[in-house]
């Protein structure tokens, strides 16, 4: 009933950017446009909870990128919780506040993104481990087209993308660093093109596929993961408690 609606339809239309689609036949809409319209129809009933089961699974990467910002805005703008089911790690990292990981119908672990992903036994396929950092946008270095982001362990430099450039200084950011993009050394590297190197302490080691090792690292109050060869781990005599330097080849801004 109209009197019981908590979500104004006009606000939903504006939030999802579908005003220009309302007069078009569904058959003429792209996959991303159809998904946004479907979300609007669900929200028009003013639900107390929005259940989304693999909502982007049929979309290609471009259409996913089109829809994700709208999904990200819904809980914040409409104050409605979303139960989001997905096998896509990048979607979970982008959207989730609290994650429940299931295997064979049973809860394996749960927690916030940083707690869940920054563990040695995070449960994802070998070679796909990723660490999550919560940070803050500190500065833009216009001359170098770089932005500085601080986290509880130091600072990182990233290319100043349009998404970063549009954010105010001090805004919160979520970053991911794939374990395969982190290398280790026992001494600082001299004369390197790498922008991001941080002192760290090894907190754990485990096998991660044939001839591979996953290392858990404490960087200040934050956690990182490094995916290295078993041979490198042996040559460096890596062990828990050892001080190392983590050299980061890639950082992704996910939120």
Predicted features along the sequence, with ranges:
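Hydrophobic anchor residue at the start of the ABC signature
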Residues: 39
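Internal alpha/beta loop-helix hairpins
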Residues: 72, 76, 86-154
């Amino acid at each position: 009933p109209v009197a019981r609606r908590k979500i104004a339809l006009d606000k939903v239309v504006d939030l999802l950017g579908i005003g220009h689609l309302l007069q078009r036949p569904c058959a003429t809409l792209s996959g991303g446009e159809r998904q946004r319209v479907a979300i609007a129809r669900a929200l028009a009933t003013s639900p107390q909870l929005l259940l989304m089961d693999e909502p982007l699974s049929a979309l290609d990467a471009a259409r996913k990128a089109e829809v994700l910002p709208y999904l990200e805005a819904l809980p914040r703008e409409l104050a409605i919780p979303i139960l989001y089911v997905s096998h896509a790690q990048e979607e979970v990292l982008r959207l989730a506040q609290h994650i429940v990981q299931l295997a064979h119908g049973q809860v394996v672990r749960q927690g916030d993104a940083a707690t869940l992903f920054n563990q040695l036994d995070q449960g994802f396929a070998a070679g796909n481990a990723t660490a999550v950092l919560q940070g803050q946008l500190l500065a833009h270095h216009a001359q170098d087209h770089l932005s500085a982001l601080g986290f509880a362990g130091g600072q990182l430099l990233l290319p100043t993308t349009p998404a970063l450039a549009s954010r105010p200084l001090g805004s919160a950011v979520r970053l991911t660093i794939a374990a395969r993009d982190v290398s280790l050394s026992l001494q600082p590297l001299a004369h390197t093109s790498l922008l991001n190197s941080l002192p760290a302490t090894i907190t754990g080691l485990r096998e991660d596929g044939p001839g591979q090792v996953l290392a858990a690292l404490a960087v200040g109050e934050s956690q990182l993961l490094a995916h290295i060869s078993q041979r490198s781990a042996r040559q460096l005599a890596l062990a828990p408690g050892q001080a190392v330097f983590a050299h980061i080849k890639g950082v992704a801004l996910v939120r």
